[in-house]
Amino acid sequence: RNYLGDRDYFKELAADKADRLVVSPPVLGRLTKKWSIQVARAIQRDGRFDGVVSIAVSPEEWAKQLASFEAGPRDTLTLVDARGHVLLRTLDGASHFGKQAPQKREYILHPEQREGHYVAHASVDGVLRVYGWTRLRNPELVMLSGIALEDALAPVREMSHRMRLRAVVSAVLFT
């Protein structure tokens, strides 16, 4: 047997009478010694809490699936809960478990907003990215897509450099 009564998702469901799905931040399994995200719902019997039913999802495997959508080597997809806890991240995933997004982010401050965007240096790796975010059907979850600006602008910078070089060569040849 595995005791779950001290897990946050279990406590949250035990204390709440509403019938809802809870997605936990990554937890380290006591038996498996592997990270998992628990997707859980309370079992109610005669209107009283009687336990939980849950499924463990591997954040590493989930992140691998999401990584197939990335365009650049430093672009990232990140799933956070409503409080900004990182559930999974496609870059360096396991090193971000338990970390939290800055509390000034719109998706934390304004739970009524469904989507948005911003430009920021990532708090976890310092890379400047433009982020788009959307609240999923479960309003407790937010998916962020971050595109590394330096990488995204590299082709434009290269073209600009070539155009300046052509202008200099043209000026030298035709003057």
Predicted regions located by residue number:
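Intrinsic low-complexity, intrinsically disordered coil/linker regions enriched in small/polar
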Residues: 45-46, 60-143, 147-155
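Extracytoplasmic/periplasmic ligand-binding sensor regions of membrane-associated signaling proteins
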Residues: 1-69, 73-76, 121-123
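Short alpha-helical segments used as structural interaction elements across diverse proteins
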Residues: 38, 86, 161-163
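Cytoplasm-proximal transmembrane signaling helix
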Residues: 150-175
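Alpha-helix boundary/capping detector
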Residues: 39, 110, 169-170
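Charged, low-complexity, helix/coiled-coil-prone segments
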Residues: 4-9, 51-53, 97-101, 130, ...
